A protein has these predicted regions:
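Juxtamembrane intracellular "pre-TM" segments in multi-pass secondary transporters
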Residues: 8-23, 209-240, 431
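Helix-loop boundary and gating motifs at the non-cytosolic
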Residues: 12-76, 238-243, 247-264, 272
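Glycine-rich segments within core transmembrane alpha-helices of 12-TM secondary carriers
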Residues: 76-79, 157-178, 365-376
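Helix-to-loop junctions at the C-terminal end of transmembrane segments
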Residues: 78-94, 182, 286-299, 383
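A membrane-interface helix-boundary motif in multi-pass transporters
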Residues: 95-98, 180-196, 381-402
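Structural signature of the two symmetry-related core transmembrane helices
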Residues: 97-112, 301-316
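Helix-loop junctions at membrane interfaces in 12-TM secondary transporters
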Residues: 115-127, 316-330
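Intracellular juxtamembrane helix-capping segments at the cytosolic ends
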Residues: 137-151, 339-353
Length: 431
């Protein structure tokens, strides 16, 4: 689509004239968007019901169960390129509103289609991949709208805080809700996810205001090309990406743990959901603690101690033999693992090249997602095909994570030697 075309963009002029009202409207769209594209994911609210269906109805082993979610998330691994496409190719005259309305509607309809999909592995997987494709596009468009609005209103801090709060709330809601849905007919899960996704449609129609703006699609692609070249030569970013990959590439045992909870501890799905609730609450406490610590400690110190704590918490799964221990271990792991994730995401933000923040950060998150779901599949395969014990898998996971810790000291001093507050003062004091 060469040449200049008329497209819709965030109504920058009207936002600047009525900043409070515009920011409130934008916040409503972002809240609905983050809620819908987070909670209604097959890897979030529908994960426990789907895992339960695959294990107990289709009698899938751990490898097949983990593989299902790896391939189900295929679209999310390609999210950075969706951002380039939605920026360059307007849909019905705009880049945000139409993409959100179309993808949210199609995602909701796809969830409803899943209700009548035969309970066969490949057919279920195909529909879930379609669902995630539409949800990923909606998430990309909502994210682009948030950035656009934040730039126009100088409200990046407030909008980011809203986004983070909604995501954490989704994690807390997910545990008991997913546990309950897994205990009843799967159709209710699909209907609930479809309903949550469709909430985004009326909110977008009512509150997302756009006006026409001239955009040269060739310029967008040229800019994307420049960003890709810049990212490809960003040694600091790739060093950080290497550390993240090593941390996440440890053989995963999320699916193996699900089977252990049901087969050995004989937990119901509602009890499994309660354990997720404990982990989610402890994760929120970790986020609060990290927010305080990052202004007092430099990133190198945070990375080392957070990754060590995550490793220690991981070893707790060696003692996962009763409900009481499970509660304590899930809480400890929710706290420790969240701290490590926050430190690594902090590293990702700092190491992304200036001018390529969105694409660079998305690429690093995609690397994280690909490694996370891929290693869960790998870990499950080790148990099923090579008869590795669960405890051996836990030790292998912890050892691989521990290897990543010394590499923190090889990261460029520029990005790890400062505290969060020092970075802010340095940025604001630039001439």
């Amino acid at each position: 689509m060469a040449g200049s075309v008329m497209v819709d963009s965030a109504a920058v002029s009207s936002i600047q004239q009525r900043p409070r009202k515009a920011l409130a409207y934008a916040a409503l769209v972002i809240v609905a968007g983050v809620l819908a594209t987070t909670l209604a994911q097959s890897q979030v609210l529908a994960r426990l019901p789907l895992q339960n269906l695959l294990k107990n109805e289709l009698h899938a082993d751990r490898t097949a169960n983990a593989a299902f979610f790896f391939w189900a998330g295929l679209a999310w691994y390609l999210k950075p390129f969706a951002g380039i496409l939605t920026d360059a190719f307007p849909l019905f005259g705009n880049r945000r509103k139409s993409y959100i309305l179309m993808s949210a509607t199609l995602a909701a309809l796809s969830w409803l289609a899943l209700i009548v999909t035969p309970h066969e592995y490949r057919k279920l997987l195909f529909v879930v991949i379609v669902i995630n494709t539409f949800m990923m596009i909606a998430s990309t468009a909502v994210g682009g709208y948030m950035v656009e609005t934040a730039q126009a209103t100088s409200g990046s801090g407030r909008l980011t805080a809203i986004r983070q709060f909604i995501q954490q709330a989704c994690l807390v809601i997910n545990g008991p809700a997913a546990g309950y849905f897994a205990s009843i007919a799967f159709g209710w899960t699909a209907a609930a996810c479809g309903g949550i996704m469709f909430l985004l449609v009326p909110v977008t129609i009512l509150f997302l205001q756009e006006q026409r703006k001239r955009l040269d699609s060739r310029e967008v692609f040229d800019n994307a090309k420049r960003q890709l070249v810049k990212i490809g030569t960003a040694r600091t970013m790739w060093a950080a990406a290497g550390l993240m990959a090593l941390f996440y590439i440890a053989p995963g045992f999320a699916t193996a743990l699900f089977y252990k909870q049901q087969n050995e501890l004989h937990l119901s799905t509602q009890t499994q959901g309660f354990l997720q609730l404990i982990a989610g609450i402890c994760g929120i406490l970790a986020a609060v603690g990290y927010g305080i610590s990052c202004r007092r400690l430099n990133l190198r110190t945070l990375l080392v101690w957070c990754m060590l704590l995550a490793t220690a918490a991981n070893l707790g799964y060696l003692f996962y033999s009763s409900m009481g221990r499970a509660q304590a271990i899930e809480g400890l792991n929710g706290f420790g693992y969240t701290l490590a994730e926050l430190a690594l995401m902090d590293l990702a933000v700092r190491s992304t090249p200036a001018g390529s923040e969105g694409l660079g950060f998305s690429l690093m998150v995609s690397i994280r997602n690909l490694a996370l779901f891929g290693t869960d599949w790998f870990g499950s395969n080790l148990l099923d095909q090579y008869h590795l014990s669960f405890d051996s898998l836990v030790v292998a996971n912890s050892a691989t994570t521990l290897i990543a810790v010394p590499l923190v000291f090889l990261l460029p001093r520029l990005i790890v030697s400062r505290k969060d507050a020092e970075i802010y003062r340095t940025t604001t004091n630039r001439p």
